[in-house]
């Protein structure tokens, strides 16, 4: 059965002055004829929440710290809550709780490295503290209360130093160049988008507690999906916490019970067209809102949503160091530009950086609902390193129209806790741990995406429709480098879609649904990846769209909705010139022989050609420039009879072709007359063997269970045939894997499988 590619119109809107990153939460816009939407292909997903410790609620502090009351005028007020519809209408709620095992709240870090001891300049510096006053002089001894006062005081190149504590600031605007906001030496600093509700405000009503106040009127119809009801409760950005633990939002007061909450707004924001938020909004009033909770808030610290945006940066050279961000509630899209309080800053990301050469390091982003946590837009040469993105309601991070951005050493886990739709959402599928669009030379290196605590096994065939991409490069990623990353129990580890060029190398994927997926992308090099116990290790397909056009007139070549970035960069959106070398595909998570014949089709390498709408055929013979030196390790021939298919066009020009040729042995491919001789190698140097996981002849140790996450050592064992037998690396691949050139050099025979990885020995603590 052939993959059906559904295309909807798309339009890109980017405006830094208006605070627009794109219409979707973090990156990538695909639209219908009336309104921008989200990215139209590929990802399918839901997320799971683990019940663990959240950021500590703090009831004390300064003016902009944790002392904000439920009636705080500066917070705005009102939250829109109406009846929800669609699947999962009561399944979502506040962003998830921070997984204590994944995020040490005292010293957030992705490794053992001590963070938070940053040098403090002697001049052009201002201090803030939770017990500070804006009437002070901003010295360490007499700190300010608010970040904005400190920022207004320093000049270009200045530094704001935050003392330890929990702050609840109004949205912070950075307009000066080369500004740094950092934690004080050794200090743990949180900025939170929630407010503490005074215990006296809670009134018992039967089995629930109610608090009425000037809470913010959040838009609950501001989704990427034009019909918000299809997103169910995920469309509702409000959050509530008891002692830092997130409560789950429900659609009515009658549904409130222990661990849940409901928000009542009598004048909510509504749609001019109930099924199309692109037609505009009837903006709700800023009046009394009532939160109903099912957990006793009177002997605890109760927090509810207050702010959507934490920080907006419009100047270059910004640095954020050791500042943890939690409990912000941006709506998912940028469509609402006249929020009663936030105006054009109600969406769609908590920390929005539109300044080049910026850095975000050593920070935790958690419990950000609906919209994304960190977004770069028109932010060239920027870097995010050693951060944690955990338990966020939607996608965690993203970049749009931002060249030379580097993500390195970050940790991602348990995002999309709001459970946005990720299957059958077509143009509105946007959820990923990180999504990048319209960029040149993005680097995603040495990051960890770990869903080992999730209560599902992504490697099961059935999870194909319930899991989403970890790293998604979509719609005009040019020459991205995705290297040395570790993925466990994820949906699709690496999704490279309608883009061009790039290197996907030395990544390790274990216990997942799909390892590497390449579609509608030319000249990408897939080298030296290790994929273990994964349902579909490598998937390469042709996208029916072409030449940067998302939608054409029926029976016509006329492009109705061109994607401007891709057309300007002359991207073909055809899967051609792909190179696949030196990968180890081991111990596929198999359901038996039926995987090769039943939908969804799966085998170590699955190829899916297609005919473009202009009639051009892109099948296996057109897809590849080279394909060789890969390693296939299967349980046995009867359980896993097919190693790869070679997809060919149908002999009937009126029909899309079936999967014509299946190979039981990798070395048979080059001998088959159907395989195009223009493709170099065609596995003449492949290693294709059988055996148990316990006796894997390649790895030092491969865990035996699909769900035995972080228990394998993917270093090659002594005497392994994969040692030193791989194809020599091109210079760009070698440099992407090891920029220093100390461990990996071009032009020399290399090991097969991952060469350098952040968790080569995943069992090592």
Positions of predicted regions on the chain:
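Bacterial N-terminal signal peptides that target proteins for export
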Residues: 3-16
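Hydrophobic helical h-region of N-terminal Sec-dependent signal peptides
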Residues: 17-22
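C-terminal motif of bacterial Sec signal peptides marking the signal peptidase cleavage site
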Residues: 25-28
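Bacterial signal peptide processing site
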Residues: 30-32
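Post-signal peptide N-terminal segment of mature Sec-exported envelope proteins
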Residues: 37-97, 101-103
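Extracellular polysaccharide-degrading/modifying enzymes targeting complex plant/algal/animal polysaccharides
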Residues: 93-355, 558, 574, 627, ...
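Glycine- and acidic/polar-rich repeat regions and solenoidal domains
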Residues: 171, 309, 330-353, 370-381, ...
């Amino acid at each position: 059965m052939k993959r059906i590619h559904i295309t909807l119109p798309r339009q890109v809107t980017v405006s830094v002055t208006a605070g627009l990153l794109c219409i979707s939460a973090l990156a990538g816009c695909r639209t219908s004829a009336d309104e921008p939407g989200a990215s139209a292909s590929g990802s399918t997903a839901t997320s799971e929440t683990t019940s663990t410790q959240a950021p500590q609620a703090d009831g004390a502090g300064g003016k902009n710290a944790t002392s904000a009351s439920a009636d705080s005028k500066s917070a705005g007020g009102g939250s829109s809550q109406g009846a929800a519809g669609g699947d999962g209408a009561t399944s979502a709620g506040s962003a998830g709780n921070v997984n204590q095992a994944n995020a040490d709240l005292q010293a957030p870090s992705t490794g053992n490295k001590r963070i938070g001891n940053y040098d403090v300049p002697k001049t052009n510096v201002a201090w803030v503290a939770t017990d500070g006053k804006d009437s002070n002089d901003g010295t360490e001894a007499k700190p300010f209360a608010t970040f904005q006062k400190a920022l207004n005081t320093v000049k270009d190149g200045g530094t704001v130093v935050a003392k330890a504590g929990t702050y609840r600031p109004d949205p912070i605007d950075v307009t000066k160049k080369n500004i740094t906001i950092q934690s004080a030496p050794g200090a743990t600093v949180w900025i939170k988008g929630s407010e503490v509700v005074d215990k006296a405000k809670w009134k018992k009503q039967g089995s629930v507690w109610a608090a009425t106040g000037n809470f913010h009127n959040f838009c609950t119809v501001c989704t990427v999906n034009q019909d918000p009801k299809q997103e169910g409760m995920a469309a509702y950005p409000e959050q509530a916490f008891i002692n830092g633990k997130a409560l789950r939002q429900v659609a009515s007061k009658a549904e409130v019970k222990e661990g849940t909450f409901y928000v009542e707004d009598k004048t909510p924001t509504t749609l001019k067209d109930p099924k199309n938020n692109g037609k505009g909004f009837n903006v709700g009033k800023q009046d009394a809102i009532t939160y109903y909770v099912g957990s006793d808030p009177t002997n605890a610290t109760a927090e509810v949503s207050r702010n959507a945006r934490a920080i907006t940066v419009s100047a270059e050279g910004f640095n954020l160091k050791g500042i943890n961000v939690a409990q912000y509630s941006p709506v998912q899209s940028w469509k609402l530009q006249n929020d009663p309080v936030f105006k054009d800053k109600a969406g769609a990301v908590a920390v929005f950086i539109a300044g080049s050469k910026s850095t975000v390091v050593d920070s935790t982003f958690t419990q950000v609902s609906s919209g994304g946590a960190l977004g770069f837009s028109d932010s060239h040469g920027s870097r995010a390193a050693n951060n944690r993105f955990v338990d966020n309601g939607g996608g965690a991070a993203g970049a749009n129209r931002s060249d030379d951005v580097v993500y390195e050493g970050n940790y991602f886990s348990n995002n999309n806790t709001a459970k946005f739709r990720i299957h059958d959402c077509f143009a509105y599928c946007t959820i990923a741990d990180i999504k990048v669009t319209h960029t040149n030379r993005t680097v995603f290196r040495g990051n960890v995406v770990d869903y080992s605590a999730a209560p599902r096994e992504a490697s099961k065939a059935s999870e194909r429709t319930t899991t989403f991409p970890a790293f998604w490069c979509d719609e005009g990623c040019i020459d991205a480098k995705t290297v040395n990353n570790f993925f466990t129990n994820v949906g699709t580890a690496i999704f490279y879609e309608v883009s061009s060029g790039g290197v996907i190398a030395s990544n390790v994927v274990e216990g997942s649904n799909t390892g590497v997926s390449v579609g509608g992308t030319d000249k990408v090099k897939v080298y030296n990846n290790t994929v273990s116990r994964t349902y579909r290790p490598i998937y390469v397909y042709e996208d029916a769209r072409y030449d940067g056009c998302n939608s054409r007139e029926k029976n016509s070549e006329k492009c109705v909705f061109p994607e401007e970035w891709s057309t300007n960069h002359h991207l073909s959106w055809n899967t051609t010139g792909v190179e696949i070398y030196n990968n180890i595909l081991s111990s596929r998570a198999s359901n038996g022989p039926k995987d090769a014949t039943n939908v969804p089709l799966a085998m170590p390498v699955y190829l899916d050609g297609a005919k473009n709408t202009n009639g051009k055929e892109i099948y296996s013979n057109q897809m590849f420039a080279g394909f060789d030196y890969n390693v296939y390790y299967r349980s046995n021939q009867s359980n896993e009879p097919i190693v790869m298919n070679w997809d060919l066009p149908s002999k009937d020009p009126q029909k899309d072709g079936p999967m014509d040729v299946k190979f039981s042995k990798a070395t048979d491919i080059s001998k088959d007359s159907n395989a195009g001789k223009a493709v170099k190698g065609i596995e003449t140097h492949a290693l294709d063997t059988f055996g148990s996981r316990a006796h894997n002849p390649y790895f030092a140790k491969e865990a035996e269970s699909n769900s035995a996450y972080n228990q394998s050592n993917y270093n090659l064992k002594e005497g392994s045939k994969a040692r030193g037998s791989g194809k020599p690396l091109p210079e760009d691949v070698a440099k992407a894997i090891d920029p220093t050139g100390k461990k990996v050099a071009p032009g020399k025979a290399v090991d097969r499988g991952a060469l350098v990885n952040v968790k080569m020995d995943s069992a090592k603590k």
